[in-house]
């Protein structure tokens, strides 16, 4: 069934507008907001679903509310950050008449401060995720620019061993320093596996269910 003529005309007008280069910067900001919202849902919803049902107590309603809240906050903040970053980046380029590398840093610095500056669990997870990748990238950039000598052997196995050694040492002896969700995961792996009463909580369940 064909669309009504009015709807076809509207779609043609919208598509014509979207193809005009003079509106590209503004439209890119809008699509960036859209992509940020969608990506936030894709990333947070599965993570919140797994973590909530594995480690959170409460009724099904409370768990679903927690999942929806975490997903909404992540999606909203990421969408607003992309919107702010692209807007500030475009504004700097427009004012100066050209694009500089510093524009990216300043736009993201301001956006990050405004949207991810609050110290909460979600922002903490996002920042730690980025921290590891930024450090990796800076090391590679240092090698690429000649500031760090290129090794003739692969440092990955040593890096892996040090990281795992440190994280288990911190968990066993300085647990409060670790991020809460990491504490929960490691408790499930390394402490809950020390306790069982019968076959049900040895293989089937993590913890025994009290008899009613």
UniProtKB/Swiss-Prot annotation:
Glycosylation sites (chain numbering): 206
Lineage: Eukaryota, Metazoa, Chordata, Craniata, Vertebrata
PANTHER family for this protein: PEROXISOMAL MEMBRANE PROTEIN 4
Gene: Pxmp4
Keywords from the named record: Glycoprotein, Membrane, Peroxisome, Transmembrane, Transmembrane helix
Statement: the UniProt record of this protein carries the keyword Transmembrane helix: yes
Assembly and interaction partners: Interacts with PEX19.
InterPro entries: Pmp4
This protein's name: Peroxisomal membrane protein 4
Keyword Cell cycle appears in the UniProt entry: no
Membrane topology label: Multi-pass membrane protein
Principal location: membrane
Transmembrane spans: 97-117, 153-173
Gene Ontology BP terms: ether lipid metabolic process
Assigned protein family: Belongs to the peroxisomal membrane protein PXMP2/4 family.
A Pfam family annotated for this UniProt entry: Tim17
Domain of life: Eukaryota
């Amino acid at each position: 069934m064909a669309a009504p003529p009015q709807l076809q005309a509207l779609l043609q007008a919208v598509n014509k507008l979207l193809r005009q280069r003079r509106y590209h910067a503004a439209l890119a900001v809008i699509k960036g907001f859209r992509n940020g919202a969608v990506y936030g849902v894709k990333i947070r919803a599965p993570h919140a679903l797994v973590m909530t049902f594995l480690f959170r107590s409460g009724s099904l309603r409370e768990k679903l509310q927690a999942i929806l809240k975490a997903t909404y906050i992540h999606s909203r903040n990421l969408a607003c950050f992309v919107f702010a970053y692209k807007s500030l980046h475009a504004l700097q380029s427009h004012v100066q008449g050209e694009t500089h590398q510093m524009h990216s840093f300043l736009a993201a610095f301001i956006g990050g401060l405004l949207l991810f500056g609050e110290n909460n669990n979600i922002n903490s997870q996002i920042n730690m995720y980025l921290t590891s990748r930024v450090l990796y990238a800076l090391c590679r950039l240092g090698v690429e620019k000649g500031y760090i000598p290129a090794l003739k052997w692969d440092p990955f196995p040593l890096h892996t061993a040090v990281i795992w050694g440190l994280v288990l040492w911190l968990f066993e002896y300085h647990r409060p320093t670790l991020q809460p969700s990491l504490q929960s995961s490691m408790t499930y792996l390394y402490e809950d596996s020390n306790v069982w009463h019968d076959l049900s909580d040895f293989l089937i369940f993590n913890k025994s269910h009290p008899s009613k």
